[in-house]
Amino acid sequence: ILMLTWEYPPRVVGGIARVVNDLSKRLIKDGHDVTVVTYREGDAPYFEVDKGVKVYRVDNFMINPNNFIDWIMQLNFNMVAKTGEIIAKEGKFDVIHAHDWLVAYAAKTLKQAYDMPIVSTIHATEAGRNSGIREANQKYINDTEWMLTYESTEVIVNSNFMKGELQRLFGLPFEKINVVANGVNLTNYTGIDRDYDFRRRYALDNEKIILFMGRLVYEKGVQYLIGAMPKILEHYHDAKLVIAGKGGMINELKQEVYNMGLGD
């Protein structure tokens, strides 16, 4: 199995890195051979075996610092070149698993060059992130998402809502889309005692905590949760909202909390 992803630990931009990391290691446990080709950031090794997963990382070069799409296309070229080297030494893969539009052109090129099928996971859509398509870059990404789903034998999404969104946006056949929900590896949290002193930093013992954990970016929707707090407090006077995360909206969200008089 060839995994194509623009992020893989130690590079973590969003949720894709965590999904690919956990999925790859679980597939190894199930007896599969998994190779990840991804972007190299910082001093991460060009090659390593991570609990059975073979991880190849490629450099990338910013031709135009102001154009993210140019950067992504260059990354796709480098992924194709690296995968070609791997195939020359080890032979073809049985399947390409492509994660989001960011690796779509690498996946399509490798499919056509080596006759390998694609399974793609669409973690989110450009239309969904932005409540529609309005700009040229958004249209480009939307079109690339369609192309990836068209080239894929099977498409994976993590919810029935996303399945409906892909059908509406791209006209995909119902049977082509498979819902595989994201999960949590509970073994990472076994044996951890409840830390009441830590909880008391944010709420009294008799108060309820609403916890948000995630990137502080528009598409995660934390702004709507903040906006709903006055209505929640009308019915649940003992509720506290705790937001854990970082991202480009952090200062905007802090200002919104201040403007609404919700901060401590």
Where do the language-model regions lie?
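Short His-centered aromatic/hydrophobic patch
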Residues: 98-103, 122
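A structural motif in glycosyltransferase catalytic domains
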Residues: 20, 27, 210, 225-226, ...
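A short helix/loop element that forms part of the nucleotide-sugar donor recognition site in Leloir-type
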Residues: 47, 190-203, 209
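Nucleotide-sugar donor phosphate/pyrophosphate-binding loop at the beta->alpha transition
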Residues: 116-119, 127-147, 193-194
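Nucleotide-activated donor-binding/catalytic signature segment of Leloir-type glycosyltransferases, i.e.
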Residues: 244-245, 251-264
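Carbohydrate-associated surface elements
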Residues: 40, 161, 183
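Conserved donor-binding/catalytic core segment of Leloir-type glycosyltransferases
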Residues: 2, 204-220, 226-229
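N-terminal subdomain of nucleotide-sugar transferases
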Residues: 1-54
